[in-house]
Curated annotation (Swiss-Prot):
GO biological process annotation, one example: sensory perception of sound
Residue positions the entry lists as glycosylated: 138, 196, 397, 449, 540, 779, 816, 931, 1002
InterPro entries listed in its UniProt record: FN3_dom, FN3_sf, Ig-like_dom, Ig-like_dom_sf, Ig-like_fold, Ig_I-set, Ig_sub, Ig_sub2
Composition bias type Polar residues, residue spans: 963-982
Region described as Disordered: spans on this chain: 959-982
Topology in the lipid bilayer: Lipid-anchor; GPI-anchor
Cysteines paired by S-S bonds: 123-173, 217-269, 322-369, 411-458, 503-551, 593-650
Cellular compartment(s): Cell membrane
Residue ranges of domain Ig-like C2-type in the record: 99-190, 196-282, 300-385, 390-474, 480-567, 571-660
One GO MF term: cell-cell adhesion mediator activity
Job of this protein: Contactins mediate cell surface interactions during nervous system development. Has some neurite outgrowth-promoting activity in the cerebral cortical neurons but not in hippocampal neurons. Probably involved in neuronal activity in the auditory system.
Lineage: Eukaryota, Metazoa, Chordata, Craniata, Vertebrata
Subunit structure, as described in the record: Interacts with PTPRG.
Name of the protein described by the UniProt record: Contactin-5
Recorded name of the encoding gene: CNTN5
C-alpha cells in the first residue's frame, strides 16, 4: 500500500507541474509536456473492454457487474448451483475468479530532454486470488532483474532513465492468478525529440523575376510530428502564405509560384515539435534575382500534391495539399470525381489545402486538384480511403460447463478492413487441435474437461488496430448432492390426485436418476412415470401408493439418495349456504361454510369476494369471520352496501388438498348515476336533454329529476320539466323556464323505492339563446348633483336577466305635468346612473322618470314612473362670524356660524389656511361634513401667523368664501427639562423638588409643572399639576413607581426630566441623597439595591 501511495503522489505532482509549464509559454517544456497519454477506449485503437464482473468499493466509480456464468452448451447448470446467488458471489471472497482488467496501459510519448527521468506504464486488475503481474516488450517477457532501471509497483511498470534505443516499442501487461492469465492491449512507448539543423552554410538560390522557386527546409531528425514555418530576413518576420506563397506541412518546403523583387532576401526554416514545443532554426537560404531578364508566362506546374492514396481513420480530420508554380499565379480548384465534396469541407491557405473534418466512410473517393492560369492548366488525382478501428459487436461471457459438454464461443467485431480473429488461452495463442476448432471468430471445444478451464481472450484486429475480449471458462466436476434441493420428508395427498415427487440432485456431469419404493425399483406404467427432470409422477393416487420412496442420483464421481414418505387421504368436500340471496342496502347476512374432511387433517378457511381475499381489518367493520366449530366457519356481513354485491368464495385448505365453493349475493339499493347527459336542442328558455338509463340496483327506477347549474345559481337546482313527472322508463325530457343567454350545465338523478342515487356526470356547458329583456331596473331614484343637472339612478339588472348581447338602458324623463318623454340611451350594462344637464332647468325642479332595458333582440319593459327633483344650486351665502383661536404650538381652532338662507343646502364646510408669507392659492384645506361649526387644525408650525377662510359646499359645488381671519400659533413649550430632582420618601408618599425651568426667547412662558407617575409594568400615568417647584406624590400600592416631571406652557408640555424609580415602602425614610437609584436604567446590581432600600434604617 505504501508503494502504491508513493506512485500516486508522484504522478499527481508531475501532472501539476505539467499544467503549470503549459501556462508559461516562454519557458522550456517540463514533465508536463513529456507524457502525452492518448485517450482511447477499448473499442478504439488497441482498446480492450474489461469484462463486467462485480462492483468493488475500492475502485471508486468503476461500473461493473457480477460474472455472467451463462451456459453456452448442452447440460448447462445455473451459477446458483455453485454460489447460491450472484449477489452472494459478489460478496463472497472465498469464490475464485480470474483476472479482470480495471486499467490497461496507455500509449506514451516521452520527451528525451525531460527533467523527469521516469516512465510509468499503468496496469491494474482484480481477481481472486489476487493476480500477479508480468510485462512484455515486443512480445518478449521482460526480466525485471536484467536491468536496474526496471521496477514494478503493484501492476505499474516503471522505467528509470528511459532510452529510445533500449526502451521504445510495444508493451503488454500479463496478469495471472490460479484461474488463469489475461494479456492487455499493446501500449506504444515513443520518444519525442527534435534535433538541430546541419550547420553548413546553404547556397543562395538565384532565379529570374516571374520564375517559380522551391526553398528546401531539410528538417533535422525528429519524433513525432513537427510544424513548419519560415522566417523572412530576421525573426520574428514570418512569411505570410497567400495564393503566391505556400508552406507545405508535409515536406516543410517554401513554394513561391511567381518570384517578385520584394521576395529577395534571406529565408530561414523554423520547425516546432508538437509534443515538446521545442523550436530550431535552419541556416539562412539567400534568394536573389538573376539579371538576365524577366521570366515569360508559362502554364502551371504542380509542385505539391497529396499522395496517390490517402488513408485516414474515421472521425479524424484529413488535410490534402495542392500547390503549383506558374506565371501568372495559378488558381487552385478542387473536385470529387463521381461525387460532391462534403459540405463540411473547408478550403484553407488560398485553396491550397482541402480540409475535411470528422471524416466518414462516405467521404472516401477520388479527389482532384486543378491548377489553372491564362497559359494553361494541370491537375492531379488521388484516392482518399477511410478506415475504422475494430469495434466489438458481440463479446464473450464467462461460462461454466459440465465436464464432457461442448463449448461454443463467438465474438464479432466490425471494422474496415474487416477484422480477423485470434484466440488466446491464459495469454498464449490457442492452436487448433482434435477437440478445438476456430473459424471466423467462433471457438468450439468438444467434450470439455478440466484441462480446458482457464482464461480465454478473443483478439479482433485489422492493419490499424486490435481489441481484446476476455472470459473465464469453468469446468464443473462433482458428485451428486441434494444439499440445495431437499425433499419433503412426508408428502400428503388425497385419493385420485396427481402426485409429483421431485428429484433434482446437483452434480456434474448431470446425474442419472433411479427410483425405488421400499426395496423394489419403481416400474413405470400408464399411471407411474419418471419425468425428464428426474421427478416421479403418480396419477390417480390410491392407498396402495402409500409408502417410502427413494430417489438416487449417480454420476462418475459418486451417488446420493433422498427418501420421502407418501400418505394418501380421503378428499375434502365443502358446502356453502345460502347459494343465492337478495338483500337491501343496510341489511345483514351470515354465510355458512361447512367442510367434510379426513379427521387426521386440520382445515383452514379463506373467504373471497369477486375472486379477491377479504381484508377484515380494512373493510370498515362490515365483515367478520366467525369460527364456531372446527369444521365450519361463518362470514357475517353487516350493514351491507352496493359494493358488497357479487360472488363470495369459501376455500378450505388442508395439508393434502384445497377445495372451494361460491355463493351469489344480490344487493338492492338506490339507483346508480345515469349515463352521459346530452343536450339535444336548446332555445331561449328550454333545453331538451337525453341520457342513458341508470343501473336500477335490483329495484326498478320510479322517476328521474333534472338539475341545472349556472354561474348565477347557488349550486345545483332542480328545474321544471316537460313532462312534469319523468318516469323511470323515460330517457329524455325538456327543462323549461330557463333564463335566456345564460350558460347552463345539466345533470340527471334517478330515484327508486329504496332511495335517490348519485347524480350523473354534468353535461357540457351550453348557453341558451338570446331573447328580448323581460326584467326592468328597480329602485329608480334621484341623486344630488351640480346646478342645472338631473341625476337619475337605478339598480343595474343582473347579467342573469340581460337575455343577450348589446344590453343597455333607456332613460326617459319629463318635467312633472308635461306629456312628451325625452329618452336617452345608456350603452353600458353595468351603468347605474345617468346625468342630464340643461342650463335652463332651475334647481329642485320635479321630473317624472322611468328606466327601461334593451339588447340586440329589442326593447324590454320600463320601470315604474317615479318623481325626482333636479339638483339644487351651490350654497349662495358665505359663513359669518368666523373666528380663529390659537390652541397650542401646533393647533388653531376655527369657528363660524351656520348659513341661514341659501339657494343650496350645505352638506359641509371647507376651511382653507395658509402662512402669512404664502399666497392664498397655495392654501391647504380641511373639510367637515354635516352641521359642524368648528374645526381644530393640527400639525401647524409654532409661533407662525396663519390666515383662514371658510366656505360651504354641497353636490352642486362651493359657495363664496367668508372674510379672511388670522391667528398665530403659540410659541413652543420649554425645551429645558426640570433639573436637580430631589425626593424624599416617607411611608406611602414621596416629596419631590426641582429647579425652575427658564424658557428661551422663542419658547412660551412656563405656566406650571406636571408630575407623571405610574407603577412599573403599567402604561398609563397619573398626573399632578402644580405652579410650585415641589409636589407630593402618593404611592398607594406596593411596588416600584416610575416618576418624571415636565414644565408646561400655553405651547404645550415641555421636555421630561430623567425618570426616577421609587419603591413603595411603609416604614423608614429614604431620600435622594442616600439612594443611588435615580434612573430607570438597570444593571446587574439593581435587585440588590432594591432589597437594600426595603430594609428599615434609622440612620436615614
Amino acid at each position: 500500500m505504501a508503494s502504491s501511495w508513493k506512485l500516486m503522489l508522484f504522478l499527481s505532482v508531475t501532472m501539476c507541474l505539467s499544467e503549470y509549464s503549459k501556462s508559461l509559454p516562454g519557458l522550456s517544456t517540463s514533465y508536463a509536456a513529456l507524457l502525452r497519454i492518448k485517450k482511447s477506449s477499448s473499442s478504439s485503437l488497441f482498446g480492450s473492454k474489461t469484462r463486467p464482473r462485480y462492483s468493488s468499493p475500492s475502485l471508486g466509480t468503476l461500473s461493473a457487474s457480477s460474472p455472467s456464468w451463462l451456459g453456452a452448451a448442452q447440460n448447462y447448470y445455473s451459477p446458483i448451483n455453485l454460489y447460491h446467488s450472484s449477489d452472494a458471489f459478489k460478496q463472497d471472497e472465498s469464490v475464485d475468479y480470474g483476472p479482470v482488467f480495471v486499467q490497461e496501459p496507455d500509449d506514451i510519448i516521452f520527451p528525451t530532454d525531460s527533467d523527469e527521468k521516469k516512465v510509468a506504464l499503468n496496469c491494474e486488475v482484480r481477481g481472486n486470488p489476487v493476480p500477479s503481474y508480468r510485462w512484455l516488450r515486443n512480445g518478449t517477457e521482460i526480466d525485471l532483474e536484467s536491468d536496474y532501471r526496471y521496477s514494478l509497483i503493484d501492476g505499474t511498470f516503471i522505467i528509470s532513465n528511459p532510452s529510445e534505443a533500449k526502451d521504445s516499442g510495444h508493451y503488454q501487461c500479463l496478469a495471472t492468478n490460479t484461474v488463469g492469465s489475461i494479456l492487455s492491449r499493446e501500449a506504444t512507448l515513443q520518444f519525442a525529440y527534435l534535433g538541430n539543423f546541419s550547420g553548413r552554410t546553404r547556397s543562395a538560390v538565384s532565379v529570374r523575376e516571374g520564375q517559380g522557386v522551391v526553398l528546401m527546409c531539410s528538417p533535422p531528425p525528429h519524433s513525432p510530428e513537427i510544424i513548419y514555418s519560415w522566417v523572412f530576413n530576421e525573426f520574428p518576420s514570418f512569411v505570410a502564405e497567400d495564393s503566391r506563397r505556400f508552406i507545405s506541412q508535409e515536406t516543410g518546403n517554401l513554394y513561391i509560384s511567381k518570384v517578385q523583387t520584394s521576395d529577395v532576401g534571406s529565408y530561414i526554416c523554423l520547425v516546432k515539435n508538437t509534443v515538446t514545443n521545442a523550436r530550431v532554426l535552419s541556416p539562412p537560404t539567400p534568394l536573389t534575382l538573376r539579371n538576365d531578364g524577366v521570366m515569360g508566362e508559362y502554364e502551371p506546374k504542380i509542385e505539391v500534391h497529396f499522395p496517390f492514396t490517402v488513408t485516414a481513420a474515421k472521425g479524424t480530420t484529413v488535410k490534402m495539399e495542392c500547390f503549383a508554380l506558374g506565371n501568372p499565379v495559378p488558381t487552385i480548384t478542387w473536385m470529387k470525381v463521381n461525387g460532391y465534396i462534403p459540405s463540411k469541407a473547408r478550403l484553407r491557405k488560398s485553396q491550397a489545402v482541402l480540409e475535411i473534418p470528422n471524416v466518414q466512410l462516405d467521404d472516401a473517393g477520388i479527389y482532384e486538384c486543378r491548377a489553372e492560369n491564362s497559359r494553361g492548366k494541370n491537375s492531379f488525382r488521388g484516392q482518399l480511403q477511410v478506415y475504422t478501428y475494430p469495434h466489438w459487436v458481440e463479446k464473450l461471457n464467462d461460462t461454466q460447463l459440465d465436464s464432457g459438454s461442448p463449448l461454443r464461443w463467438e465474438c464479432k467485431a466490425t471494422g474496415k478492413p474487416r477484422p480477423t480473429y485470434r484466440w488466446l488461452k491464459n495469454g498464449v495463442p490457442l492452436s487448433p487441435q482434435s477437440r478445438v476448432e476456430m473459424v471466423n471468430g467462433v471457438l468450439m471445444i468438444h467434450n470439455v474437461n478440466q484441462s480446458d478451464a482457464g482464461m480465454y481472450q478473443c483478439l479482433a484486429e485489422n492493419k490499424y488496430g486490435a481489441i481484446y475480449a476476455s472470459a473465464e471458462l469453468k469446468i464443473l466436476a462433482s458428485a451428486p448432492t441434494f444439499a440445495l434441493n431437499q425433499l419433503k420428508k412426508t408428502i400428503i395427498v388425497t385419493k385420485d390426485q396427481e402426485v409429483v415427487i421431485e428429484c433434482k440432485p446437483q452434480g456434474s456431469p448431470k446425474p442419472t436418476i433411479s427410483w425405488k419404493k421400499g426395496d423394489r425399483a419403481v416400474r413405470e406404467n400408464k399411471r407411474i412415470a419418471i419425468l425428464p427432470d428426474g421427478s416421479l409422477r403418480i396419477l390417480n393416487a390410491s392407498k396402495s401408493d402409500e409408502g417410502k420412496y427413494v430417489c438416487r442420483g449417480e454420476n462418475v464421481f459418486g451417488s446420493a439418495e433422498i427418501i420421502a414418505s407418501l400418505s394418501v387421504k380421503e378428499p375434502t368436500r365443502i358446502e356453502l349456504t345460502p347459494k343465492r340471496t337478495e338483500l337491501t342496502v343496510g341489511e345483514s347476512i351470515v354465510l355458512n361454510c361447512k367442510a367434510i374432511h379426513d379427521a387426521s387433517l386440520d382445515v383452514t378457511f379463506y373467504w373471497t369476494l369477486k375472486g379477491q381475499p377479504i381484508d377484515f381489518e380494512e373493510e370498515g367493520g362490515h365483515f367478520e369471520s366467525i369460527r364456531a366449530q372446527a369444521s365450519s366457519a361463518d362470514l357475517m356481513i353487516r350493514n351491507i352496501l352496493l359494493m358488497h354485491a357479487g360472488r363470495y368464495g369459501c376455500r378450505v385448505q388442508t395439508t393434502a388438498d384445497s377445495v372451494s365453493d361460491e355463493a351469489e349475493l344480490l344487493v338492492r339499493g338506490p339507483p346508480g348515476p345515469p349515463g352521459i347527459v346530452i343536450v339535444e336542442e336548446i332555445t331561449e328558455s328550454t333545453a331538451t336533454l337525453s341520457w342513458s338509463p341508470a343501473a336500477d340496483n335490483h329495484s326498478p327506477i320510479s322517476s328521474y329529476n333534472l338539475q341545472a347549474r349556472s354561474p348565477f345559481s347557488l349550486g345545483w337546482q332542480t328545474v321544471k320539466t316537460v313532462p312534469e313527472i319523468i318516469t323511470g322508463d323515460m330517457e329524455s325530457a325538456m327543462a323549461v323556464d330557463l333564463n335566456p343567454w345564460v350558460e347552463y350545465e345539466f345533470r340527471v338523478v334517478a330515484t327508486n323505492p329504496i332511495g335517490t342515487g348519485d347524480p350523473s356526470t354534468p353535461s357540457r356547458m351550453i348557453r341558451t339563446n338570446e331573447a328580448v329583456p323581460k326584467t326592468a331596473p328597480t329602485n329608480v331614484s334621484g341623486r344630488s348633483g351640480r346646478r342645472h343637472e338631473l341625476v337619475i339612478a337605478w339598480e343595474p339588472v343582473s347579467e342573469e336577466f340581460q337575455n343577450g348581447e348589446g344590453f343597455g338602458y333607456i332613460v326617459a324623463f319629463r318635467p312633472n305635468g308635461t306629456r312628451g318623454w325625452k329618452e336617452k340611451m345608456v350603452t353600458s350594462s353595468e351603468a347605474s346612473k345617468f346625468i342630464y344637464r340643461d342650463e335652463s332647468v332651475p334647481p329642485l325642479t320635479p321630473f317624472e322618470v322611468k328606466v327601461g332595458v334593451y339588447n340586440n333582440k329589442g326593447d324590454g319593459p320600463f320601470s315604474q314612473i317615479v318623481v325626482i327633483c333636479s339638483a339644487e344650486g351651490e350654497p349662495s351665502a358665505a359663513p359669518t362670524d368666523v373666528k380663529a383661536t390659537s390652541v397650542s404650538v401646533s393647533e388653531i381652532l376655527v369657528a363660524w356660524k351656520h348659513i341661514k338662507e341659501s339657494l343650496g343646502r350645505p352638506q359641509g364646510f371647507e376651511v382653507g389656511y395658509w402662512k402669512d408669507m404664502e399666497q392664498e392659492d397655495t392654501a391647504e384645506t380641511v373639510k367637515t361634513r354635516g352641521n359642524e361649526s368648528f374645526v381644530i387644525l393640527t400639525g401647524l408650525e409654532g409661533n407662525t401667523l396663519y390666515h383662514f377662510t371658510v366656505r360651504a359646499y354641497n353636490g352642486a359645488g362651493y359657495g363664496p368664501p367668508s372674510s379672511e381671519v388670522s391667528a398665530t400659533t403659540k410659541k413652543s413649550p420649554p425645551s429645558q427639562a426640570p433639573s436637580n430632582l430631589r425626593w424624599e420618601q416617607q411611608g406611602s408618599q414621596v416629596s419631590l423638588g426641582w429647579e425652575p425651568v427658564i424658557p428661551l426667547a422663542n419658547e412660551s412662558e412656563v405656566v406650571g409643572y406636571k408630575v407623571f407617575y405610574r407603577q412599573e409594568g403599567h402604561s398609563n400615568s397619573q398626573v399632578i399639576e402644580t405652579q410650585k417647584l415641589q409636589a407630593v406624590v402618593p404611592l398607594p400600592d406596593a411596588g416600584v413607581y416610575i416618576i418624571e416631571v415636565r414644565a408646561y406652557s400655553e405651547g404645550g408640555d415641555g421636555t421630561a426630566s430623567s425618570q426616577i424609580r421609587v419603591p413603595s415602602y411603609s416604614g423608614g425614610k429614604i431620600t435622594s441623597a442616600q439612594s443611588t437609584l435615580h434612573s430607570l436604567s438597570t444593571s446587574s446590581s439593581s435587585v440588590t439595591l432594591l432589597l437594600a432600600l426595603m430594609i428599615p434604617s434609622t440612620s436615614w
